[in-house]
Protein backbone atom coordinates (compact mmCIF):
# COMPACT_ATOMS: atom_id res chain seq x y z
CA UNK A 1 0.00 0.00 0.00
CA UNK A 2 1.70 3.27 -1.10
CA UNK A 3 2.34 5.90 1.51
CA UNK A 4 -0.32 8.63 1.25
CA UNK A 5 1.73 11.58 0.07
CA UNK A 6 -1.12 13.68 -1.31
CA UNK A 7 -1.20 17.38 -0.48
CA UNK A 8 -4.31 18.22 1.50
CA UNK A 9 -6.57 21.18 0.79
CA UNK A 10 -5.86 24.43 2.66
CA UNK A 11 -2.52 23.31 4.10
CA UNK A 12 0.06 24.81 1.73
CA UNK A 13 -0.19 28.42 2.92
CA UNK A 14 0.14 27.29 6.53
CA UNK A 15 3.22 25.24 5.68
CA UNK A 16 4.81 28.27 4.03
CA UNK A 17 3.98 30.44 7.04
CA UNK A 18 5.63 27.93 9.37
CA UNK A 19 8.99 28.02 7.61
CA UNK A 20 11.88 29.09 9.87
CA UNK A 21 12.63 32.84 9.84
CA UNK A 22 15.92 32.32 8.00
CA UNK A 23 14.03 30.92 4.99
CA UNK A 24 11.16 33.36 5.33
CA UNK A 25 13.64 36.13 4.57
CA UNK A 26 13.83 34.88 0.97
CA UNK A 27 10.06 35.13 0.55
CA UNK A 28 9.57 38.74 1.64
CA UNK A 29 10.52 40.46 -1.62
CA UNK A 30 7.31 41.63 -3.34
CA UNK A 31 7.88 39.63 -6.55
CA UNK A 32 8.58 36.45 -4.60
CA UNK A 33 5.61 36.96 -2.28
CA UNK A 34 3.34 37.48 -5.31
CA UNK A 35 4.67 34.35 -7.00
CA UNK A 36 4.14 32.27 -3.87
CA UNK A 37 0.60 33.58 -3.41
CA UNK A 38 -0.13 32.85 -7.05
CA UNK A 39 1.10 29.27 -7.01
CA UNK A 40 -0.75 28.57 -3.75
CA UNK A 41 -3.97 29.94 -5.26
CA UNK A 42 -3.51 27.79 -8.37
CA UNK A 43 -2.86 24.65 -6.34
CA UNK A 44 -5.85 25.23 -4.09
CA UNK A 45 -8.02 25.69 -7.16
CA UNK A 46 -6.73 22.44 -8.67
CA UNK A 47 -7.33 20.59 -5.41
CA UNK A 48 -10.88 21.95 -5.29
CA UNK A 49 -11.36 20.65 -8.83
CA UNK A 50 -10.36 17.16 -7.72
CA UNK A 51 -6.73 17.08 -8.83
CA UNK A 52 -4.28 14.96 -6.86
CA UNK A 53 -1.15 16.94 -5.97
CA UNK A 54 2.14 15.65 -4.53
CA UNK A 55 3.86 15.81 -2.09
CA UNK A 56 2.09 16.35 1.22
CA UNK A 57 5.01 18.45 2.49
CA UNK A 58 6.37 20.57 -0.39
CA UNK A 59 8.75 22.55 1.86
CA UNK A 60 10.30 19.54 3.57
CA UNK A 61 13.77 20.22 2.10
CA UNK A 62 13.93 23.38 4.25
CA UNK A 63 12.91 21.76 7.52
CA UNK A 64 15.62 21.37 10.14
CA UNK A 65 18.20 23.01 7.89
CA UNK A 66 18.98 26.73 7.92
CA UNK A 67 20.78 28.45 5.01
CA UNK A 68 23.91 28.64 7.16
CA UNK A 69 23.72 24.89 7.83
CA UNK A 70 23.74 24.00 4.13
CA UNK A 71 27.02 22.48 2.98
CA UNK A 72 25.95 20.88 -0.30
CA UNK A 73 23.13 21.79 -2.70
CA UNK A 74 21.64 19.22 -5.09
CA UNK A 75 18.92 20.59 -7.36
CA UNK A 76 16.12 18.58 -8.90
CA UNK A 77 13.43 19.72 -11.31
CA UNK A 78 10.01 18.68 -10.01
CA UNK A 79 8.72 15.98 -7.66
CA UNK A 80 8.04 12.40 -8.68
CA UNK A 81 4.48 12.24 -10.01
CA UNK A 82 3.36 8.78 -8.89
CA UNK A 83 1.47 7.74 -5.74
CA UNK A 84 3.65 7.28 -2.66
CA UNK A 85 6.83 8.61 -4.26
CA UNK A 86 7.51 12.31 -3.68
CA UNK A 87 8.33 13.35 -0.12
CA UNK A 88 9.60 16.89 -0.55
CA UNK A 89 13.28 16.04 -1.08
CA UNK A 90 14.78 16.03 -4.57
CA UNK A 91 15.49 12.49 -5.87
CA UNK A 92 14.35 10.89 -2.58
CA UNK A 93 11.50 8.41 -2.10
CA UNK A 94 10.38 6.41 0.94
CA UNK A 95 12.34 3.27 1.73
CA UNK A 96 9.44 0.99 0.85
CA UNK A 97 8.98 2.60 -2.57
CA UNK A 98 10.48 1.13 -5.75
CA UNK A 99 13.80 2.86 -6.42
CA UNK A 100 13.45 5.34 -9.32
CA UNK A 101 15.99 5.06 -12.17
CA UNK A 102 17.69 8.40 -11.42
CA UNK A 103 18.22 7.46 -7.77
CA UNK A 104 19.51 4.07 -8.86
CA UNK A 105 22.15 5.79 -10.98
CA UNK A 106 23.03 8.14 -8.12
CA UNK A 107 23.66 5.21 -5.80
CA UNK A 108 25.61 3.34 -8.49
CA UNK A 109 27.87 6.35 -8.94
CA UNK A 110 28.46 6.61 -5.19
CA UNK A 111 29.35 2.91 -5.00
CA UNK A 112 31.80 3.40 -7.87
CA UNK A 113 33.53 6.30 -6.14
CA UNK A 114 33.87 4.67 -2.71
CA UNK A 115 35.37 1.26 -3.39
CA UNK A 116 33.95 -1.47 -1.20
CA UNK A 117 31.00 0.59 -0.01
CA UNK A 118 27.68 -1.25 -0.42
CA UNK A 119 24.71 0.19 -2.23
CA UNK A 120 22.24 1.67 0.28
CA UNK A 121 19.21 -0.50 0.93
CA UNK A 122 16.92 2.45 1.63
CA UNK A 123 15.79 5.22 -0.71
CA UNK A 124 15.00 7.96 1.83
CA UNK A 125 17.72 10.63 1.64
CA UNK A 126 16.79 12.30 4.93
CA UNK A 127 20.15 11.08 6.24
CA UNK A 128 21.83 13.41 3.74
CA UNK A 129 19.80 16.43 4.82
CA UNK A 130 20.89 15.86 8.43
CA UNK A 131 24.46 16.34 7.25
CA UNK A 132 23.74 19.66 5.54
CA UNK A 133 22.70 18.53 2.05
CA UNK A 134 19.88 20.64 0.60
CA UNK A 135 17.81 18.50 -1.79
CA UNK A 136 15.70 21.14 -3.51
CA UNK A 137 13.41 20.75 -6.49
CA UNK A 138 12.92 23.95 -8.46
CA UNK A 139 9.18 23.22 -8.66
CA UNK A 140 7.84 22.01 -5.33
CA UNK A 141 4.58 20.34 -6.38
CA UNK A 142 3.24 18.22 -9.23
CA UNK A 143 -0.07 16.66 -10.23
CA UNK A 144 -0.56 12.92 -10.34
CA UNK A 145 0.78 11.46 -13.57
CA UNK A 146 1.61 14.86 -15.06
CA UNK A 147 5.32 15.72 -14.90
CA UNK A 148 6.13 19.44 -14.87
CA UNK A 149 2.43 20.25 -14.42
CA UNK A 150 3.23 23.03 -11.93
CA UNK A 151 6.29 24.36 -13.75
CA UNK A 152 6.06 28.02 -14.73
CA UNK A 153 3.29 28.57 -12.17
CA UNK A 154 5.51 30.59 -9.85
CA UNK A 155 7.54 27.98 -8.01
CA UNK A 156 10.71 28.84 -9.92
CA UNK A 157 10.60 32.43 -8.66
CA UNK A 158 10.27 31.11 -5.11
CA UNK A 159 13.03 28.51 -5.37
CA UNK A 160 15.35 30.92 -7.19
CA UNK A 161 15.03 33.18 -4.15
CA UNK A 162 15.83 30.27 -1.84
CA UNK A 163 18.86 29.26 -3.92
CA UNK A 164 20.08 32.87 -3.97
CA UNK A 165 19.71 33.09 -0.19
CA UNK A 166 21.89 30.01 0.27
CA UNK A 167 24.41 31.22 -2.30
CA UNK A 168 24.81 34.57 -0.52
CA UNK A 169 25.65 32.93 2.80
CA UNK A 170 29.20 33.69 3.90
CA UNK A 171 30.17 30.02 4.12
CA UNK A 172 31.09 28.45 0.76
CA UNK A 173 28.88 25.59 -0.42
CA UNK A 174 29.18 22.81 -2.97
CA UNK A 175 26.59 23.02 -5.75
CA UNK A 176 25.96 19.85 -7.77
CA UNK A 177 24.25 20.90 -10.98
CA UNK A 178 23.01 17.88 -12.93
CA UNK A 179 21.40 18.57 -16.29
CA UNK A 180 20.67 21.77 -18.20
CA UNK A 181 17.80 22.79 -15.94
CA UNK A 182 19.96 22.76 -12.81
CA UNK A 183 22.95 24.27 -14.61
CA UNK A 184 20.83 27.26 -15.62
CA UNK A 185 20.73 28.16 -11.91
CA UNK A 186 24.46 28.89 -11.85
CA UNK A 187 23.62 32.51 -12.67
CA UNK A 188 22.20 32.79 -9.14
CA UNK A 189 25.62 32.13 -7.59
CA UNK A 190 27.69 35.24 -6.83
CA UNK A 191 31.07 35.56 -8.52
CA UNK A 192 34.12 34.98 -6.32
CA UNK A 193 31.96 33.36 -3.62
CA UNK A 194 34.28 30.42 -3.05
CA UNK A 195 31.53 27.93 -3.89
CA UNK A 196 32.44 24.61 -5.48
CA UNK A 197 30.33 24.13 -8.62
CA UNK A 198 30.28 20.69 -10.25
CA UNK A 199 28.31 20.03 -13.43
CA UNK A 200 27.27 16.85 -15.24
CA UNK A 201 24.32 15.42 -17.11
CA UNK A 202 21.16 14.54 -15.23
CA UNK A 203 21.29 11.05 -13.63
CA UNK A 204 18.25 9.93 -15.63
CA UNK A 205 18.99 6.87 -17.81
CA UNK A 206 18.20 9.09 -20.81
CA UNK A 207 21.29 11.22 -20.21
CA UNK A 208 23.46 9.61 -17.52
CA UNK A 209 25.96 8.17 -20.04
CA UNK A 210 25.73 10.85 -22.72
CA UNK A 211 28.86 12.89 -23.53
CA UNK A 212 30.41 15.35 -23.08
CA UNK A 213 29.64 15.35 -19.32
CA UNK A 214 28.08 11.99 -18.40
CA UNK A 215 26.76 11.65 -14.88
CA UNK A 216 28.08 8.13 -14.52
CA UNK A 217 31.79 8.54 -13.87
CA UNK A 218 31.51 12.20 -12.79
CA UNK A 219 33.25 11.69 -9.43
CA UNK A 220 31.16 14.40 -7.78
CA UNK A 221 30.61 12.76 -4.42
CA UNK A 222 34.29 12.10 -3.72
CA UNK A 223 35.21 15.55 -5.03
CA UNK A 224 32.75 17.18 -2.64
CA UNK A 225 34.25 15.26 0.26
CA UNK A 226 37.80 16.19 -0.74
CA UNK A 227 36.75 19.85 -0.97
CA UNK A 228 35.07 19.72 2.45
CA UNK A 229 38.17 18.10 3.96
CA UNK A 230 40.37 20.84 2.48
CA UNK A 231 38.24 23.32 4.41
CA UNK A 232 38.57 21.36 7.63
CA UNK A 233 34.99 20.10 7.49
CA UNK A 234 33.56 16.64 8.01
CA UNK A 235 32.92 14.78 4.74
CA UNK A 236 29.39 13.69 3.83
CA UNK A 237 28.60 10.06 4.55
CA UNK A 238 26.71 9.30 1.36
CA UNK A 239 25.92 5.66 2.13
CA UNK A 240 25.53 4.68 5.79
CA UNK A 241 21.92 3.97 6.73
CA UNK A 242 20.67 5.86 9.78
CA UNK A 243 20.20 2.62 11.70
CA UNK A 244 23.69 1.34 11.00
CA UNK A 245 25.38 3.28 13.78
CA UNK A 246 28.36 5.58 13.56
CA UNK A 247 29.52 7.21 10.36
CA UNK A 248 32.19 5.15 8.62
CA UNK A 249 34.77 7.92 8.52
CA UNK A 250 37.40 5.70 6.90
CA UNK A 251 35.30 5.17 3.80
CA UNK A 252 34.15 8.73 3.32
CA UNK A 253 37.21 10.67 4.39
CA UNK A 254 40.49 10.92 2.52
Swiss-Prot record:
PROSITE patterns: U_DNA_GLYCOSYLASE
Name of the top EC class for this enzyme: hydrolase
GO cellular component: cytoplasm
SUPFAM superfamilies the record matches: Uracil-DNA glycosylase-like
Record SMART domains: UDG, UreE_C
Gene3D superfamilies: Uracil-DNA glycosylase-like domain
Keyword Hydrolase: yes
Reaction catalysed by this enzyme: Hydrolyzes single-stranded DNA or mismatched double-stranded DNA and polynucleotides, releasing free uracil
GO biological process terms on file: base-excision repair, AP site formation via deaminated base removal
CDD domains attached to this UniProt entry: UDG-F1-like (cd10027)
Keyword terms of this UniProt record: Cytoplasm, DNA damage, DNA repair, Hydrolase
InterPro entries to which the protein is assigned, alphabetical: UDG_fam1 (IPR002043), Ura-DNA_Glyclase_AS (IPR018085), Uracil-DNA_glycosylase-like (IPR005122), Uracil-DNA_glycosylase-like_sf (IPR036895)
NCBIfam families found in the cross-reference section: PRK05254.1-1, PRK05254.1-2, PRK05254.1-4, PRK05254.1-5, ung
Summary of the function given for this chain in its UniProt record: Excises uracil residues from the DNA which can arise as a result of misincorporation of dUMP residues by DNA polymerase or due to deamination of cytosine.
Name the UniProt record assigns to this protein: Uracil-DNA glycosylase
Lineage, opening ranks: Bacteria, Pseudomonadati, Pseudomonadota, Betaproteobacteria, Burkholderiales
